[in-house]
Amino acid sequence: MTCNVAFIGLGVMGYPMAGYISKAGHNVSVFNRTTTKAEKWIYEHKGKMASTPKEAAEGADFIFTCVGNDEDLRQVTLGENGLFHSAKEGSIYVDNSTVSAEVSRELYNKAKEKGFAFLDAPISGGQSGAEGGILTVMVGGDEEAFKKAEPVIDCYSKKVKLIGQSGSGQLTKMMNQMCIAGVVQGLSEAINFGINAGLDIDKVMETISKGAAQSWQMENRYKTMVEDKFDYGFAVDWMRKDLKIVIEEAKRNGSPVPITEIVDEYYADVQKMGGNRWDSSSLIARLKKKK
């Protein structure tokens, strides 16, 4: 069934995600703060460009957002020209941003007051996952709204799962980022250790990747880490933003996260090296620098 869809936020993730929704045959209206991005998207895909989030959401059955942080999300939803001023009763709003569970719960309640549904649905898989339409989506919210939205979310994902009530999607994404941070630091230490020991890293990785040490990061990032190439994905600035959310939420629910806190400090070191836009595998750079 063809639906009217609004997509707000055409960054490295949102741009291809909106494209997959359009390719599936839905009528897509897009908004992006940088209008040239939206113009480029319109040139490449079927759809129309809106001048504000409010305009994009008018008449939409499903509204999607993919923006940078809590402040950006509040601006495109509750701001003067935010989508909450035009979202129609009975529509479903799916937020793919990685933000705090607190703001997700706030928007869930405000949407409910206005007669439409809200799902927090952060994504994992990076730029390559978005471009390949194979993202993993972790969702928080009401089951009825989820079942209606799932076919549209499927357009850009390989796995979508309703975790629980509002905020559960964001909490799951926090766990995801904690796991990635720890794995990348461990892999960085191991690669640096192997280099210093004079080992053939390709042979080592070919061997240990078939055992218990195997990970997505090992399979997809070890070669670029060895070569000091850090332009393949999720930027350090964004990882630090996510880890800040993790640490703040951990304080709220009483969970000690000592490794996450340490790795966050290591990412701060990478920023001081000028690596703000390097991808998250760049933790190895600070180890090589310490030689």
Regions found by a protein language model. Name each.
Residues 214-280:
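Interdomain hinge/lid region at the active-site interface
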Residues 28, 49, 118-119, 160, ...:
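Hydrophobic beta-strand scaffold residues
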Residues 132-133, 137-140, 165-197, 209-220, ...:
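Active-site-proximal catalytic alpha-helix in oxidoreductases
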Residues 1-65, 91, 96, 127:
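NAD(P)+-binding Rossmann beta1-loop-alpha1 motif at the extreme N-terminus of oxidoreductases
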Residues 53-116:
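Rossmann-fold NAD(P) dinucleotide-binding segment
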Residues 93, 99-177:
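Rossmann-fold dinucleotide-binding core
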